[in-house]
Amino acid sequence: MSTIVLVTGGFDPIHSGHISYFKNAKELYPHTPLCVGLNSDDWLIRKKGKFFLPMKERRAIVKELKPVDLTITYDDTDNSSNMAIYKCLQMLSLIHI
């Protein structure tokens, strides 16, 4: 069975603590793909009442970080967090439809 590391959050705005989070995850599992799940703008509005950076911007920044192998986006109002994991596995070709 293949393994992935999935870390999730709003990352709005991205800061040094988030980067340490990604680095630490990658250091713990250096040969395992690191997938970062970003919460949607709607999720951030529900949680904080607003968002600072749109999801497209947050994703563009996060995907350029060295420890990150893959980014996915999701909205946690339903089972979409489960779908986010599924999508990540699919993108890494670990499961097939």
Please place each PLM-identified region on the residue numbering.
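Nucleotidyltransferase catalytic core that binds NTPs
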Residues: 1-95
